[in-house]
A protein has these predicted regions:
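Partner-binding and oligomerization surfaces adjacent to conserved cores of proteins
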Residues: 2-340
Length: 340
């Protein structure tokens, strides 16, 4: 049963037009899912450079990049065009008072305090950090990012689904990690927005008028838009078949975030230089990363290459040199032919 259905069941048998008595305990419930999760994506592949792969092996962490510094820094506001289109096409289907509550909600920045999913970090300013993966284990589109002189010097890591578990929350630091596939098609995006707006409208229409309920609906939709924006991309990128892990981090915790390995603390928030830009990121350790056997990486692919045999031999040597074991990790070569 959905959250709104549970809420409405409290007034079962009553007229749905603002007749259900409003009680403040309603405000403690979540009206919307915080994000759209597509659990059909069972395998996720992270494409990276040789240097990136070595860093992952050595530190047992993945780098999550600040959403403001992704390749297309404007992508977080892609949802705004979809919201504008949605209201243009659907405004007539809702009471104007409801429309006026949420019609103008948009993503305007990369840092906000809308995310209230984390216990005790409600209303805390947060930033979003992204790890990009693909659902395609041998994608020419993705290999091209690592192309030089006809060689594709990239590697593709199959990430075990629970390596960076979705809906994972560190209640001490306030960090949460969520996962979902990226939506490219406008029709799909419109359907996702429609489901969320309809759910809110059903609740708003059923309960008696209350300013507190109105404010709750505004907050819920603002929160939902802020997170969902990270999973909407322009249709021109659809060949990437992207799926994402997103870490949501309280801004005031960034400089103190750390993890412990062999009794030594490691800072999670750091910077690297990408195309001349100081780019912030956080290191996210694998689940169970402190064990002698690593389950996080299921396979490693080698990009299209004329010397793939040598790359495979070097990769095998590197894996054997690690101070932990990769459990049944398979190495495979791209089937895409090399062209010069």
């Amino acid at each position: 049963m959905d959250n709104d259905d549970r809420l409405l069941s409290e007034g079962k048998g009553m007229n749905e037009n603002h007749e259900i008595k409003f009680r403040e305990r309603v405000l403690s419930k979540s009206f919307l899912d915080r994000f759209y999760v597509d659990n059909t994506c069972s395998k996720r592949y992270h494409y990276t450079s040789p240097e990136g792969l070595m860093g992952i092996f050595k530190t047992r962490t993945f780098y999550f990049t600040d959403s403001q510094f992704l390749n297309d820094f404007r992508e977080k506001i892609n949802i705004n065009d979809e919201l504008k289109l949605f209201w243009k096409e659907n405004q007539k289907n809702y009471d104007i008072k409801f429309v006026n509550l949420i019609k103008n909600i948009r993503v305007t920045q990369y840092e906000d305090n809308s995310f209230s999913y984390i216990d005790n970090h409600n209303e805390t300013m947060c930033r979003y950090f992204v790890l990009s993966l693909s659902m395609n284990e041998d994608s020419l589109t993705m290999w091209k990012y690592y192309s030089k002189n006809g060689e594709y010097n990239g590697y593709c890591i199959e990430v075990f689904d629970y390596a960076l578990t979705d809906e994972w929350i560190d209640r001490v630091t306030g960090v949460t990690v969520i996962a979902s596939k990226v939506e490219y098609c406008s029709d799909e995006k419109q359907e996702i927005i429609l489901r969320s707006v309809d759910r809110l409208y059903k609740i708003w229409k059923s309960y008696e008028f209350s300013e507190m309920l109105d404010n709750k609906i505004i907050k819920e939709f603002t929160s939902w838009v802020s997170v969902e924006a990270l999973f909407f991309k322009d249709e021109c990128f659809q060949d990437e078949q992207e799926t994402r892990y997103v870490a949501i981090v309280p801004t005031n915790k960034l400089n103190t975030l750390h993890y412990t390995y062999k009794e030594k603390e490691y800072k999670m928030y750091d910077f690297r230089i990408v195309n001349g830009v100081f780019t912030p990121f956080i290191r996210m350790p694998f689940n169970y990363w402190n064990e002698e056997v690593c389950l996080a990486i299921s396979s490693i692919g080698i990009g299209p290459s004329a010397n793939s045999e040598q790359k495979e031999a070097g990769l095998e040597q590197l894996i054997r040199s690690l101070d932990y074991k990769l459990d049944e990790c398979k190495i495979y070569k791209s089937k895409i032919p090399v062209r010069y």
